[in-house]
Amino acid sequence: MLSKLFVFLLICYATADEVDKKEAKHGFQLFHWNWDHIHKVYVITTWLLVASLAKILFNLMKPLSKWLPDSSLLIIVGLGLGYFLNQTTLSGVHLDSHAFFLYLLPPIIFDAGYFMPNRALFKNFDSVLVFSVLGTLWNTFAIGGSLLIMSKYQLFTMPFTTFEILVFSALISAVDPVAVIAIFEEIHVNEFLFINVFGEALFNDGVTVVLYQMFKSFALIGSENLSPWDYATGGLSFFVVALGGAAIGIIFAIATSLATKYTQGIKILAPVFIFLLPYMAYLTAEMVSLSSIIAIAVCGMLMKQYIKGNITEAATNSVKYFTKMLAQCSETVIFMFLGLSTLTSEHHVDFIFIGATLVFCLIYRAIGIIVQCFILNKFRAKKFEVVDQFILSYGGLRGAIAYGLVVSIPASIQAKPMFITTTICVIYFTVFLQGITIRPLVNCLNVKKKEHREATMVESVYNKYLDYMMSGVEDIAGQRGHYSFIENFERFNAKVIKPVLMRHEKRQSFDATSIIRAYEKITLEDAIKLTKVKSTLQNKRLEKVKSEVRVAPEQTTVTPKDVQLARFMQSGENIDQLYTLFSDLLDKKLNELKVQADKVDKANDDDIQDDYMAEMGSHSNLGFMHHSADQLDSDSVFQRRGRRLSTGDLKGHCGTSRKPKHSMFELRHV
């Protein structure tokens, strides 16, 4: 036994010595090639760098970027990259569905939820809910049923079952919020149309994923193995998954707000909670098989108004920029992978299936929008016009969500290559053809555009006033509409939610709305004025009594300065010189204010806005501000002897030989 152990140790020593000698032959190397150690991270970084440089190049090419959306340009870059990879040994590069749903999709949905204009969404919540839920159900079953009927006549080259085609019809019904935002922000449609298209695209994705998962489970089980209980459970899961995802989003929104509330001692940690907790909401929903898209979208929407009161302005801007950066990187990678997969993925081209899918997508979306708008118009004050219905039908762009779902179809489904090819063709059709032509159509149909100006203070106050007035009308009529719900929520928000979730908010024992507070303030000021008037009248009566008692009134003393000033005021030339001096000073001050406003506008114009509504009008507001400043400069006036005179008129007037006489009162009045 000892001899065997000795032989083993001897062999190990000899082998080690031989290896050391072999390594020693090469000697010391100054540089080492460690590609295997860093190649994955390096490829990802290079990918993002190429995509970012491509977007910069597109932005510099104004004629090209004016007509082609960014998404279509990135797909073109992906096509070029795919052709290059096909000529090399890296032709197997593809987008993994696991990476898509866990790393690329969450930043996009969080960005859409965080920058969602909540007030506009709630005012149109009925239409958004109808379009995203009922519209998605209609498109899924209509497209799937039509393709299934055609397959019975053996018109397609690959067979599929009922649930397999429903899996495909569910994913092809997903309207992409990325493509919708990119297109509709550029054409500056009105807020009513934008919020309906954007809201539908966001929540439509959550509904689509729920349907997709349900039909995929049915397809894997097999229709012959399904029982009525399975169908009932699947239908119930549609509501459980959606509402459960929303509940998780609410819980994590509260957790994020509370976490940021107590970070005043360590402010650097606040942005960490803002990004980690929503992502944990997404992962938690995935873990328990609930809607992760709805979870992170709801979390972003709800936490925004509370975390702004808990963090500094600099931290708020940092959060906005980092959110946008993550979303832009994810969108860029996804669209480039769309172009790449055209040449690198396994395809099965069936022209009849592709053509039928395109036609059914267009026809059934138009039918669904028309019918839903017809029903909604019977119960809405703000009606959907014919032009609005056309843009809603034409704006159903497909994109990243549909592609991510189709590549995650199980390999056991035989028709998967045909589904992938058809999905890519539908995405290309909607992004390129519809995305390019929607701008000319909007201009041709005279679709109402967003007003490129900020609301005045009076408009803001009266908009709030109208909301409360409508709430009062609903209360008098004995009805409970969304105006009453808004009032009740704002009251509950001020009394309970804000004091709990925000740092410097105190519990309010009354309805602390701006209108009521303004009314109470005015009433209090009127009472104070009446008290002062009463006190003044009493003082005047006392002074009158005292003056009657006086034997000799006091004489007013005239100082030498008063005499000198009176002589100066009697000269007309001096008055004209004063006008000239005031005019020059005013013009100089206006120019300084204009230059300062230009600097502020240039600094703030490219800044990220709080939501997508503000982003649509940010660039146009700059021109409006410049026009207002110019108008103020040209219309600046003095009041002289009851006449309006511009500063230019004053300069010309001061050069005349007319020398009017002015009293001290008139100069002070000026």
Curated annotation (Swiss-Prot):
* CC terms in the record's Gene Ontology section: endomembrane system; plasma membrane
- Which stretches of sequence are listed as region Disordered? 648-670
Instruction: Look up the signal peptide feature and give its range.
Output: none
Q: Which Gene3D superfamilies match?
A: 6.10.140.1330
Swiss-Prot/TrEMBL GO biological process terms? potassium ion transmembrane transport; regulation of intracellular pH; sodium ion import across plasma membrane
Query: Which residue positions carry a glycan here?
Result: N310
| Residue stretches in coiled coil | none
Question: What does the entry state regarding organ or tissue expression?
Answer: Expressed in hypodermal cells of the main body syncytium, ut1 cells of the vulva and the spermathecal junction cell.
Membrane topology per record: Multi-pass membrane protein
Query: Which stretches are transmembrane?
Result: 41-61, 73-93, 97-117, 129-149, 164-184, 192-212, 235-255, 268-288, 325-345, 351-371, 390-410, 418-438
Major subcellular location class: membrane
Q: Where does this protein reside within or beyond the cell?
A: Endomembrane system
User: What are the entry keywords?
Assistant: Antiport, Glycoprotein, Ion transport, Membrane, Phosphoprotein, Sodium, Sodium transport, Transmembrane, Transmembrane helix, Transport
Q: Could you tell me the superkingdom of the organism this chain comes from?
A: Eukaryota
Cited InterPro entries: Cation/H_exchanger_CPA1 (IPR018422), Cation/H_exchanger_TM (IPR006153), NaH_exchanger (IPR004709)
What Gene Ontology terms describe what this protein does at the molecular function level?
Answer: potassium:proton antiporter activity; sodium:proton antiporter activity
Concerning PTM, the database record says:
Phosphorylated.
Q: What protein family is recorded?
A: Belongs to the monovalent cation:proton antiporter 1 (CPA1) transporter (TC 2.A.36) family.
Q: What is this protein called?
A: Probable Na(+)/H(+) antiporter nhx-3
**Organism expressing this protein natively:** Caenorhabditis elegans
Designated gene of the protein? nhx-3
